[in-house]
């Protein structure tokens, strides 16, 4: 990581102010009282932490305000962010070394709408330490391990490290191989192999973990799917998901053989309760590909699948995806619940290729289609509240992705956002992430 290290100079230090000082028409200031209160006597271990708190910390406080949790929950969540997330973000300005979003910054923010009520706020985190990317921790495994240990010490409700240890033992290569991985694989940068995710819901923090498969495949010489099958077989007595996993992998091997499952995720809870999500990507953007993914190449049929395809086709039209090809890869995941024989499908639409104002109007149109009329009406103003420093007619990265899952229980829409309130709006599209 030496080539990517960013030093905060004395000229930079102390110049970052809270991200947003305006008020919106509903008289909500862009600096919630929760953030101001926790900032008053805050002590940080470094100038970088202070600047992260003043930028992304203030932005996160606005997201928590949008999520409409009670004041006690907002304080608890912000304290978690300050104590766990902020220290794991590394230098400020940020190192551009992460593959969880188009900004290459190691934090991603999202809102999950499960109906017309309040959304669930979520954070994805690629922790950074002084060892990250160095020969001491080339694939960032030790740094993630330390963060998971810290989470365990906090005493999060239902937190369980069983699957963390299991999948780490199955996919993380020996230390000596890890030290030479970047050179041996000829990758331009040694991305982290594991990242974390947090859902702030019902007063609790639910933790998820993601792992990339190509590192283990390169080190072992095995196909990524062979390692996935082996790893799942060893915990299937608890997760009860092998039938659905095999269905997904067979589809991928038939229709997407050039790009095997690049990463997958699970919940850090008891394995018998954990979901498993297998991700796929393709550089082919077409409606035919969406239908193929949603039906597993024709193997998934029925009213629920038909409804999903019908709604996705309408969203495809709202986003005008017949008129241009997004610069990001087409992405999806298959979510498998314990005991489930067929997965739920989530489709991700890249929305960073047009103005944020245009995207906000499209999101409003989508919410109206679902009957969430108040959420639809307020969404453009919600975005201006979250990002008051952007001219939304000119910027195009306040949003990054929009994802949809349609199940028998309802329609779930997630929107993913730029993690900075003050930072530069530029981003580079890498086709070598996976």
Swiss-Prot record:
Q: At which positions is L-tryptophan bound?
A: 104-105, 108
Give the span(s) annotated as Disordered: 1-35
Function as written in the Swiss-Prot or TrEMBL entry: Prenyltransferase; part of the gene cluster that mediates the biosynthesis of penigequinolones, potent insecticidal alkaloids that contain a highly modified 10-carbon prenyl group. The first stage is catalyzed by the nonribosomal peptide synthetase penN that condenses anthranilic acid and O-methyl-L-tyrosine to produce 4'-methoxycyclopeptin. 4'-methoxycyclopeptin is then converted to 4'-methoxydehydrocyclopeptin by the ketoglutarate-dependent dioxygenase penM through dehydrogenation to form a double bond between C-alpha and C-beta of the O-methyltyrosine side chain.
Assigned EC number: 2.5.1.-
Record key words, sorted? Transferase
Thylakoid keyword on record: no
Which pathway does it serve? Answer: Secondary metabolite biosynthesis; Alkaloid biosynthesis; Mycotoxin biosynthesis
Q: Which GO terms describe its molecular function?
A: transferase activity, transferring alkyl or aryl (other than methyl) groups
| NCBIfam families, sorted | arom_pren_DMATS (TIGR03429)
InterPro entries found in the cross-reference section = Aro_prenylTrfase (IPR033964), Aro_prenylTrfase_DMATS (IPR017795), DMATS-type_fun (IPR012148)
Residues engaged in binding substrate: 122, 208, 275, 277, 279, 348
In terms of CDD domains, this protein maps to: PT-DMATS_CymD
- Natural source organism: Penicillium thymicola
* Family the entry assigns: Belongs to the tryptophan dimethylallyltransferase family.
Task: Specify the enzyme's EC class, one word.
Answer: transferase
- GO biological process terms held by the UniProt record: alkaloid metabolic process
Tree of life domain: Eukaryota
Instruction: Report the catalytic activity.
Output: yaequinolone E + dimethylallyl diphosphate + H2O = [(1'E)-3'-hydroxy-3',7'-dimethylocta-1',6'-dien-1'-yl]-quinolinone B + diphosphate
Compositional bias ranges of the Polar residues kind: 1-14, 21-35
Write down what this protein is called. Prenyltransferase penG
